[in-house]
Structures are given as C-alpha cells and as structure tokens.
Amino acid sequence: MTVNTKTYSARAETHASPVAQRLFRLMESKKTNLCASIDVDTTKEFLELIDKLGPYVCLIKTHIDIINDFSYESTIEPLLELSRKHQFMIFEDRKFADIGNTVKKQYIGGVYKISSWADITNAHGVTGNGVVEGLKQGAKETTTDQEPRGLLMLAELSSVGSLAYGEYSQKTVEIAKSDKEFVIGFIAQRDMGGQEEGFDWIIMTPGVGLDDKGDGLGQQYRTVNEVVSTGTDIIIVGRGLFGKGRDPEVEGKRYRDAGWNAYLKKTGQL
C-alpha cells in the first residue's frame, strides 16, 4: 500500500473538507502532528493539563463523559478559550455506534452538546452508512460554515484482541467513501489507501509511545517512527505525556519533536 508522502500544506490546498484544510494548515504553522489524549476525571486537572500541553499539539482529544464535575460553563467554555489561546483543534473521542437518528441526538443534545464545540468526532462502522448521515445532519443543524465539523471512522484499534481488522476494516473504508467532505479520515494503525480514487484520508493513530510497550490492560504501544513511516499523519499520545512522574511540558516538546521529525523524514524534507 502506498503511503502519502505529500506535505501537510500541499494536502490542505486540495482537500475536500474545510476541517481537514484547517487542521493541515494548523499542523504546518505550529510544526506539530501531536494529538494529546486528556483522560482525567476532574475539570481542574483537565484544563491545567491542556494549558500546559496546548503549545505543543495540533489537537486535544477528549473523553468528555469521564469528567465527574462536568458542566458546559466550567468545562467547555474554558476549553474553547484555551483552544483559541494555544491554537489547537478539539477531537471528542465519542465512538458513536448506533443508528443514524440516535447518534444525531447523542451528538447534538444531552448534557454534552458535542457538535457545538468539538471540531472532530468519530464513529464505528458497525451500524453502516446511517451513522455518517445522522452525524452529518446533526452538524448541519447546529453549526455554521464558519465552524465546520469532521468525522473519523474507526478502522483499526491499538488494543490486544481488537475485532477491528481485515474485512471489518475494509467495510469501514467503504462507508467512509460515502461522504468525501464530512468523513476526513480514520483511527487506524496504517495508511488506509483511497488515493487512487481521489480520497485523502487523515490517519490518526493511538497507542504511540517513546518509552513503554504496553500498560497491562490491553494497550500496545508502537514507536513514533514506526507509525509515521506506515502512514500515520497524527500521533495520539496520552499517559506518555502526563503519566506518573512525567512533566507534561517536557514530554509535550519531546513527542512534538519526534512526530515532526518523523513527518519530515517521510516527506523527504529531512
């Protein structure tokens, strides 16, 4: 499979999605392809970590339903302020997996109102094309052209024993082909193809580590160079940035530099 070796700025020029265009330009201007996964359970720690890591990332990935003291005013509004301060985009890792009408309601409503603040979210392909259509409708109804939204499909996972591989992954790719503008890419471990058909999917990869090989709970880690050389555009790192004994600012810079150098190498700029 051919790995995309174009620069982020070149891809921004030709991409069908306004969200992808914005993300590529942001990555190029900040010189980072790092996404920080902030899985903590209090608003205070959540915002403090994001403020420290913000300068080094292109994306902050949230699991907003983990936060015990969540409120829109105290959690989301400060998050949006930090996104403006540090110039990053927001990815809510919701993993929608229901019929179109249900995911639309989950996306736009409830206490979280995800569509109102998350630039990007994601979904499983298990329920078919309806999940894409439902989320797209939700985005259209709650946002403007000035705040476009994008969707990632879960093609592959980094956990031991994952069922997302082989035929399942290929069928998820077929679902992604149903909407060139709203579906911007995949959560995957490698390039998912599509270039020959005019698609330019962004590949975001979790389970990336510079030090650890696993966590004892099924997570497997691969190196930055390994994932970028096989097609990853954005590396997703969580505990490697702020786990026990780790300084988020030191690790943020370390992972940012490792990811960017791997990208420069892949695109022949280094």
Curated annotation (Swiss-Prot):
InterPro entries named in the record: Aldolase_TIM (IPR013785), OMPdecase (IPR014732), OMPdecase_AS (IPR018089), OMPdeCOase_dom (IPR001754), RibuloseP-bd_barrel (IPR011060)
Positions of substrate binding: 39, 61-63, 93-102, 221, 239
Enzyme class, broadest EC rank: lyase
CDD domains: OMP_decarboxylase_like
One cellular component (GO) term of this entry: cytosol
Keyword entries, A-Z: Decarboxylase, Lyase, Pyrimidine biosynthesis
Domain of life: Eukaryota
Pfam families assigned: OMPdecase
Catalytic activity: orotidine 5'-phosphate + H(+) = UMP + CO2
Catalytic residues of the enzyme: K95 (proton donor)
Entry EC number(s): 4.1.1.23
GO MF annotation list: orotidine-5'-phosphate decarboxylase activity
This protein's pathway: Pyrimidine metabolism; UMP biosynthesis via de novo pathway; UMP from orotate: step 2/2
Alphabetical GO biological process terms: 'de novo' pyrimidine nucleobase biosynthetic process; 'de novo' UMP biosynthetic process
Family: Belongs to the OMP decarboxylase family.
NCBIfam families (alphabetical): pyrF (TIGR01740)
Name the record gives this protein: Orotidine 5'-phosphate decarboxylase
Organism phylogeny: Eukaryota, Fungi, Dikarya, Ascomycota, Saccharomycotina
